[in-house]
């Protein structure tokens, strides 16, 4: 050891050590107390200093061992599977492609934008390969499919950085690559790249060679890569569509129809877009059904379209081998039949080796035929589809199909040996036995279960679509949510078809809710035509073949059953329409021609009424089908599925399909067809003005609906799957019961299929309904029975190998012809409507311009009008029109039911007047705002719920009547061979004109009446009336529903329903004439109807009264159609009241009306009626009057005049309560919305009707029966416009408004003077609350309005009033006669109608003279129109929404007490007691607005029309306080202190001056600066009395003191001129430029101080002085005189004199009047 180491005598320890360490070194640490003392430590324990204070190291350890070092966490993320080209299985929808992004969107922004919807894994923005420019494309990969779907749902078509972006789910970025190539190739810019299918697919169609090259390049990664282009590749089961992936329709799951464009690097092709499917079916089973995605339901049309479309991968864009042919059929087939993508559809399913090129659609007819075939097959698809639902696993699919399909079928489904990847993971399905005759399940050929798949392979392998059909419909399938994403890429790339004019027109028409309901959409035509083209959607995929599964068998392409099947499952055409381009909702079975785009709300809210099949008498069926399967029996009938867009005819080479027996008339519709809350809400949205429904209300209503359904026995036969995967809750529109008879026979004879599977399947089968009109279809009766045709074809094609080719050619020809015809028809209709509308408008204007015609002319005109009407049988016109080329002849209309789908012309106006509104308008002598067209369009659907046409006991919707009528009219204009009917367009237009003339007549007659009362008003009213009439006339033709229908139909309604009550002014006069004419016309007009209505006897009083009272009665047309007991017209009924079951008879003179129809129901289907204008006549039109004697209606006639003078105590009923939510709920929505006036205004309910309604439901059944039958006798042409159920009460009631009623109406008639009421009636006690039975009316009553609830004193019966004033009766009658004659004279209608008018007047006077003055018979017992079940329930359960009010409480208690008194089975009630519930629905009265609450109200009620009113100074002074409180407080404050300071400053200034001593110094800058410093004053600005703002002193200012400096920018003259111009342009009206000298100006406009607020005054209290400080000129304001606190500072601007004077506003005595 080194001796120095110890240092300084330090001794080393005596022991041997191995290590030592110098612990302390004094040289390094001089602060140590012990100098030069080194301390060593040996071996970590011993120290060289004995008394060392250091501690030894206790735990010795190897320094090389890092025990104490911290372990660092190492994250090893779980590796994620990469979905490369070898991936097999469902590709999760985690990848979202964004297009059309703003080029400022970068990864971080996009990631943040998407992060809110789910965890983002990768974000990539595509840049141009060379320029690195932003391409507007981005890829976002989410960790979950939910995030991706939510992103697409929320971001698609939203604006991001100013761009409407396109987001879609994109499997493996195939669409993104298409966009990328389109942009990089220069074909499109990032903002114009087509995200819609047609342009995109066409862009990629390319030539075959190009397709091959690009495909070879692209497909290297796909499972078909192993095969040369053009060879058939064994369809990998994994492929939803084995067809070449590049085909537009490959993987049906892609968002865009052309999911695999020709240039798409389609590597994932092996897996169809199955991920969408919620069902786990394996990919190989090709179950990439669109239904799969559970996240949200695709829109019906999209889904159906995309599924059928994407499934039918018929794109020809792919390489020859995999052309579209292979695609569609094989697509589905490959899954199960594993036939190669190209071969399966083209070659027989069994031989997948045959190449697809064989049928590749080389001949254009092939694709077109395919299209039609697909459409057809989609409808005829059979239950086998269910297999997938029940057994989704792909592996077992073959076995399933073996069970379900006939052996022949399954043999085709058997997996092919050459399946590429399929064999790896899927055991081949057992080979099926050799083909046997197809079983029902197998259906015919491809149409059979699997074949039904959209492209569902040649054998009917469950195509993705097929499978989808099997999957239960989900209430919210992705597509329906509207997000493009899950709905298969089809939607994400909406087709460019929309850019075509036809398609856009079609979409516009769709928005109008199918005015042309029978027209096939142009999109379909376009698709059919283009299907042969490169982008043919359905092109070569399915090759029709006669053989059941022969090489040519086109697999049916069912519409997306997820959406369609459930809804339209019962329709013959359910999915028959060609798949629509994306975005164009394919008319699901629920949609009719133009109706195709029925959105969810429409779907829920307005399904078209079920067609009434019985009207088409089909020939007897060769094999009569068995009764409908139980599943059909259990289906709710309320919603007839929408009619398919159009049905393609079966291939001509097949034998004619067997006919089906006419289905029985459908049972009455029931509201309990809302199978789930979504449906209910949808319907409610349309029906009840979008009223909010709480969860409890929905629940209770649905429960009640279910109970009602069961109670009605509708579910009695529900042997279907009880609440199965597709319980009724999933069926938006289950097929109507009659649909069962339309089913193909195969469906009935389900072999082993078993009823359960059958019924479930059938839910989603489009059930062909032979009788369905198929409005937009060009299908004839036999075509409606395609399933049989298909089987026949299959059988025949086995015999004739060329049958398939022939069929395709013929189908193509037929299709082209149809499309041409449809286009021509569309054009013709549009032209007719447009020209007709113009003619009507012209006529109405001419009429308006004419002076009143003399009576002779008017009579002549009326006679002409009658002749015209006699000439026009509405039904025949329809028939003739159909014969002459109306879409497919009468079969398409199925007579009555076809009318629903028949010519519904679009409305060319924004608003349309409803007939009742028109009448009211004429009543009130001012046109009423008409209801928006949209509402009218909703009406038919809304009404459907109340009454389906053809359902016993229900009224056909008014729209139907209108349509029937207008169809008669408009069709007539196109008829080529009229055959007993006028073919000329004139007849229709003339009739319309006549109708309008009638309107005008009526209105003018009313005006004449008014003139007698008040000429000034009459003249006013006339103008307005003629306006309204002109509107009517215009509308009459333009939309074929309103003007003419309102008149002619109301007239027609009155024809059978004595028009008196139709005193709805518009139809009053015309109704009378029309009655006479139309009643005569009816027998001829409606051949189907067997009950002729003889011309009413001339002595008919009804019209007379209607006319007389019409001026004062805006009654809804519904009254015009009282239910008349249909006795022979000749028998005058006894004048005694009839039993309640029938409307009380009127006096003999009215008898013909009453007894026109036999009271017993006639087995004719009632033609559709028009919607009710308002719920009932009682509802909106009259204030309820307590029960008068039975003769009340008659009294109304005879004493009508008297009643006007009787003071009217208006009962407070639900009807005339304020228009709040409860009243809305308690009435039909049309009452408020459509009627054009709110319920509060419609307080005119006749006594008779009120009482009749009150009397309960005993009358209702008979009334209903009559009501349902009434239209049957009434020829379609003469259907009433608004025949409301109230009309059913008595023809007399309807015929003549009650006198009291007329008085009430007079009160609400703003054009007529009100006669003073002579007496006050005695109040009557309240009516008893309706019994419980009334609350839940029977189904038959559902069309009728609910009984009114009287909530206040009623007035005494009319009878008493009339007895009190019998003497007035005669006077009033005479007055009426005078009024009538005057009105008829004053009517300004064309000469053609005048004759009719004379005749009518003579008839009226005749009947009047003969009318006995005897007291009328006692009034009929009160009868109320019962509420429909739906309305009843809505009112009942509205307490969940609006709360419980006192009235509800009282009725609940009353009901409770009555139930307690009943001994029937409610023992549990005895254990309950009534507990008062808190009233939760308290109406808070509106605070009355005080006049000073704000600016005055606008005179017109619209600020937009008037802008702001200028506020006068007087008005300003009311609230403008010039002196704020602070200033006033200063006034009283101590101003002495300030004055003292001022005087001190002045004195200091004087001392300073005297010290300087020279006067020259007075001008020095120093002094001036001093002044500026010391002389600033306290000022404020405020509102000035002179002009705008002003400057006010806040302290007293002495004379000659500086007040303020004018501060601003020093600018030159030139700059000032420029600024002044700019300020004027910017709208800065005031000038703040102050000139200092000739070249310097101070601009205080933008920067300055308070001095700029100083106003000009001709006698100012200040002056401006320019001083120079530090060589800078300043403007200083000095006081001229002492200025007090709050006095405004003013000075004279001294503007130079100019010609253009600026007015001075100072208002002083010496004001010069101008500033310059």
Curated annotation (Swiss-Prot):
GO cellular component: cytoplasm; euchromatin; histone methyltransferase complex; nuclear speck; nucleus; Set1C/COMPASS complex
Compositionally biased tracts (Basic residues): 1399-1412
Span of the annotated motif RxxxRR motif: 1546-1551
Motif range (WDR5 interaction motif (WIN)): 1501-1506
Motif (HCFC1-binding motif (HBM)): 1307-1311
Bias (Basic and acidic residues): 859-869
GO molecular function: histone H3K4 methyltransferase activity; histone H3K4 monomethyltransferase activity; histone H3K4 trimethyltransferase activity; RNA binding
One of the GO biological process terms: regulation of erythrocyte differentiation
Domain RRM: 84-172
Domain of life: Eukaryota
Name of the top EC class for this enzyme: transferase
Family the entry assigns: Belongs to the class V-like SAM-binding methyltransferase superfamily.
Functional description taken from the UniProt entry: Histone methyltransferase that catalyzes methyl group transfer from S-adenosyl-L-methionine to the epsilon-amino group of 'Lys-4' of histone H3 (H3K4) via a non-processive mechanism. Part of chromatin remodeling machinery, forms H3K4me1, H3K4me2 and H3K4me3 methylation marks at active chromatin sites where transcription and DNA repair take place. Responsible for H3K4me3 enriched promoters and transcriptional programming of inner mass stem cells and neuron progenitors during embryogenesis. Required for H3K4me1 mark at stalled replication forks.
This protein's name: Histone-lysine N-methyltransferase SETD1A
Native species: Mus musculus
